[in-house]
Amino acid sequence: MTYEAEMEQIVSTALTLQDDYIKFTPRNQNMACHAEIIGIFHDIHPTVEIKEPHQDKSVLQETLVELYSVLGIPQEPQVSKTMKFEEPEQHKESSSTVTRSDSLVNSLQSTGLKRPFCEDEHREYKKPLIQAEDISPATSTRSRKRTIYSKEQTNFLQNQFDLNPYPDFVNRCRIAKITGIPEPRIQVWFQNRRARHLPRATTFHSPQGRKSPTSEGPRSFLSREAHYPDEWGQAPNPSNTQPYPN
């Protein structure tokens, strides 16, 4: 017998067996169990019509319940088999935080109240405000700063004040060049000196009825200024002495 003939015989035998046993071959384990139960039920109650299993799960479940009740088999309450996936703890915490924040926002929107401060925000809120003295220390120190004059500078300024308590800009610049003091400082010094001494000096009269030297006016001081010896070693030349213009 050739190889092809053997293959044809095997195939025909397999087809014959499949045609003979197709009705008795269960599709799966559940179908085999169901067929066994139906066979037992048919032996006990041959008059009951057995329906073919329906594809619908609900109909199949009702059929099984009816079958169990007839057989007297106690049934346990069926629990719905739902897959419960356990979420990671981190995901649970984040979801709970989001839920709390959403509920807080909704409650605040409904009530119209201000939200409470968090711990970090509360700590920042408790910090003291910057004082005004810390913001501008330069201005306060600048306003309190005083110019310290040397003894020679003070004597020279006092002598110039005795000669003319109202020096103009040209005279102040000359005094600044001699003493090395800025002209604005010299102007302030003369203003302070006039505020302290001039009111008393103008109202003062000697017992003989003569006025004080300061009441003679600025013109007399200009004529006397040329004959005053220079404190800084630069005596003016008498031949070139002229009164300074006002």
UniProtKB/Swiss-Prot annotation:
Keywords: Activator, Developmental protein, Differentiation, DNA-binding, Gastrulation, Homeobox, Neurogenesis, Nucleus, Transcription, Transcription regulation, Wnt signaling pathway. Named 'siamois' (French for siamese) because ectopic expression leads to the formation of embryos with duplicated axial and head structures, which resemble siamese twins. CDD domains: homeodomain. Most abundant in dorsal-vegetal cells of late blastulae/early gastrulae embryos. InterPro entries: HD (IPR001356), Homeobox_regulator (IPR051306), Homeodomain-like_sf (IPR009057). The record marks 191 as: Determines DNA-binding specificity. Its main location: nucleus. Essential for Wnt/beta-catenin-mediated formation of the Spemann organizer and for induction of the organizer precursor, the Nieuwkoop center. Acts as a transcriptional activator, cooperating with TGFbeta signals to induce a program of organizer-specific gene expression and to generate an organizer with both head- and trunk-inducing activity. Activates the head organizer gene cer1 by acting synergistically with otx2 and mix-A/mix.1 through the 5'-TAATCT-3' element of the cer1 promoter. Also binds as a complex with lhx1/lim1 and mix-A/mix.1 to the 3x 5'-TAAT-3' element of the cer1 promoter. Residues 95-107, 203-217, 236-246 have a biased composition (Polar residues). It is found in: Nucleus. Induction: By wnt-signaling and by the dorsalizing factor LiCl. Activated in the dorsal side of the embryo by a ctnnb1-tcf7l1 (beta catenin-tcf3) complex. Repressed on the ventral side by tcf7l1/tcf3 alone. Autoregulated by siamois itself. Residues 84-94 have a biased composition (Basic and acidic residues). GO terms for biological process: cell differentiation; mesoderm formation; nervous system development; positive regulation of DNA-templated transcription; positive regulation of transcription by RNA polymerase II; regulation of transcription by RNA polymerase II; Spemann organizer formation at the dorsal lip of the blastopore; Wnt signaling pathway. GO terms for molecular function: DNA-binding transcription factor activity, RNA polymerase II-specific; RNA polymerase II transcription regulatory region sequence-specific DNA binding; sequence-specific DNA binding. The keyword DNA-binding applies. The gene is siamois. One of its GO terms (cellular component) is transcription regulator complex. Pfam families: Homeodomain. Residues 84-107, 199-246 are annotated as: Disordered. Residues 142-201 bind DNA. Gene3D superfamilies: Homeodomain-like (1.10.10.60). This is Homeobox protein siamois.
